[in-house]
Design a protein with these regions (language model features):
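N-terminal juxtadomain amphipathic helix
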Residues: 21-97
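Conserved class I S-adenosyl-L-methionine
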Residues: 118-128
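Conserved SAM-binding loop of SAM-dependent methyltransferases across substrates and taxa
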Residues: 129-139
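Conserved SAM-binding motif I beta-strand of class I
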Residues: 141-146
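Conserved SAM-binding strand-loop segment of SAM-dependent methyltransferases
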Residues: 158-170
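A conserved beta-strand element that flanks and buttresses the S-adenosyl-L-methionine
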Residues: 184
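A short glycine-rich, Lys/Arg-flanked "PGG" loop and its adjoining helix->strand segment in the class I
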Residues: 196-211
């Protein structure tokens, strides 16, 4: 049985994929019973780093709705993923010492749970600068998937296969001689416009005894 580990899974903030397009149904259950919680008006994208001081920062409507059917709290508008997480996205895991410690501890726990063998496949979806995969030895087959890899390539260990794109199973099929023993999605699952489709595609490339580890923020604790 495939083991899917969720940390603070569905009660999260969802940011999605079409610039400033208002949704009319829940991203999780497709219910139309959406109740507006608050509206903060038009806001700039906080993860967008400027190339020059006169560059325009993309913005969009920041309002939240609550699904009365499945209880998912989510953004009312969708945003273009290529703009939010393209070449102007500025976050790097390696700049934060506490994050590196967290990722290292996570890798140790996953190794223990998964009982990894040589050449087992590990896929990190949203791999950023490769920090998490760097805690796995070269004896494993490692794949990082992230739309910012092009500009962060120099931070990746040479043995890590890099896919400079958003996750779709067809993008990684050519690298698969077998399915993955571990797939991780760290602080990116809430960015999905279609989380159920994403989950199915992860399932399709996961071994029957594999582990999918998802980590997200938990809204009640954030408040």
């Amino acid at each position: 049985i495939k083991k899917i580990f969720f940390i603070c899974f569905f009660i999260s903030i969802y940011i999605s994929v079409i610039i400033n397009m208002k949704i009319h149904k829940c991203r999780s259950c497709n219910s139309v019973k959406l109740k507006k919680i608050f509206d903060l008006g038009n806001q700039k994208l906080t993860g967008f780093f400027l190339d020059h001081k006169n560059q325009n920062i993309p913005s969009g409507s920041l309002s939240m709705v609550f699904c009365e059917n499945c209880k998912l709290l989510q953004l009312e508008n969708s945003f273009e993923a290529e703009i939010m997480y393209g070449q102007n996205y500025g976050y790097m895991s390696s700049l934060n010492k506490s994050m590196l410690m967290h990722l290292n501890n996570k890798s140790l726990k996953l190794k223990k749970i998964a009982k990894l063998q040589n050449r087992d496949l590990i896929i990190d979806i949203g791999s950023n600068d490769g920090s998490f995969l760097s805690f796995f030895e070269s004896k494993y087959k490692l794949i990082g998937i992230d739309p910012t890899i092009k500009k962060l390539k120099k931070f990746y260990r040479k043995d890590i296969i890099q896919i400079d794109n958003f996750f779709k199973k067809e993008f990684i099929k050519k690298h698969l001689d077998k399915n993955a023993k571990i797939i991780t999605s760290i602080s990116m699952f809430y960015d999905l416009e279609n989380p159920l489709k994403f989950s199915q595609e992860v399932y399709d490339v996961l071994r029957d005894d594999g582990i999918w580890h998802v980590e997200q923020s938990y809204m009640p604790m954030m408040l």
